[in-house]
Amino acid sequence: MNSTQRFEHKVVIVTGAAQGIGRGVALRIAQEGGCLILADRSDLIQAVLAEIKALGALAIAVETDLETYAGAELVVSHAIAEYGRIDVLINNVGGAIWMKPFQEFSEEEIIQEVHRSLFPALWCCRAVLPEMLKHQQGTIVNVSSIATRGIHRIPYSASKGGVNALTASLAFEHAQHGIRVNAVATGGTKAPPRKIPRNAQPLSKSEQVWMQQVVDQTIDRSFLGRYGSIDEQVNAITFLASDESSYITGSVLPVGGGDQG
């Protein structure tokens, strides 16, 4: 186990925990003594659960669709049944499905982007809040994006702008109840290929060009001229989730090599 036990005896929900940043966050919290509820709609979450149990940490996994309020309620009910309370919620579900100019998006595609990248955070905050209010304490970290100012992802950008507004307003509304709410605006992040792609369709030549333009813009706007690593994002997320950030709330922390979004 990690010598730093920032999450000892803490009950932590991590959504979107089956791969990428979510998996990295879950493993770090397990190494630091946390009791975990892993949530994802993919059965890949079971492999992450096995990894965490191999570390000797306490964890359960809930396969559910967090684009629905019922899915968020299911996660909370499992957490309460298993541990009796919730100390930390980390909302990590989201990600751009398509990359193309706004006029190329259909109505249905726009709806899918918003459902994917805004509603899971809204639903999970709403579902967990009564439990945190009951105990007059809690910490929420929303994973946002520096793409709130960027090209070819406007529905996703608007969704993450909504996550930032949710973060600020919820922090303002519930600070008096001992609940802190912050966000990490992740920049471009190097990660293994997704086991379940957000968009499984082959890219057209135009879509390949548009995607490369997004990559180029991301690197150009980073002062450090590179993508970040999963560990670098995990460092920021777990800092805001821990008591080390006890005097920080209502903040959006950009982690994009200097790109402020």
Swiss-Prot record:
It comes from the Bacteria. Coiled coil: none annotated. Its EC number is 1.3.1.25. NAD(+) binds at residues 13-37. It catalyses: (1R,6S)-1,6-dihydroxycyclohexa-2,4-diene-1-carboxylate + NAD(+) = catechol + CO2 + NADH. The keyword Oxidoreductase applies. One of its GO terms (molecular function) is oxidoreductase activity, acting on the CH-OH group of donors, NAD or NADP as acceptor. It is an enzyme of class 1 (oxidoreductase). Pathway: Aromatic compound metabolism; benzoate degradation via hydroxylation; catechol from benzoate: step 2/2. PROSITE patterns: ADH_SHORT. GO terms for biological process: benzoate catabolic process via hydroxylation; fatty acid elongation. Keywords: Aromatic hydrocarbons catabolism, NAD, Oxidoreductase. The active site is at residue 156. Pfam families: adh_short. Substrate binds at residue 145. Homodimer. PANTHER family: OXIDOREDUCTASE (PTHR42760:SF123), SHORT-CHAIN DEHYDROGENASES/REDUCTASES FAMILY MEMBER (PTHR42760). Degradation of 2-hydro-1,2-dihydroxy benzoate (DHB) to catechol. This is 1,6-dihydroxycyclohexa-2,4-diene-1-carboxylate dehydrogenase. The gene is benD.
